[in-house]
């Protein structure tokens, strides 16, 4: 029984995921009925690029152009950090990188402030967190949150 508990704990703490803003099919997203309890798995093995192959969902949060998105990463295997990119997309396929952290993401920090450009267009958008781990197998992780941006001055 103890071995089963330890193995269960190991898988429960496996890898990392974006918790805020709440990603598609996340346990952190209110009202989701088809929760993905494997959000910490890398892409591949049934989870495709972009956004783990999940279709767009409800808007998890609204932001104003120029505002910072407070991002929280959680999980138990940060692989000694790595490289994170935070990006926005309006079509769910083409992403514009708006913030990069080299070498130290998500370790030691797990909270990030990512500013939306002031001239970013208004409308529904996809906010993506992409992570390449530093040690172990080279893996790519991605979580996407459906957001809405208001007050932008660019063209949509």
Task: Enumerate the language-model features and the residues they cover.
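Structured recognition/catalytic domains enriched at protein termini
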Residues: 13-156
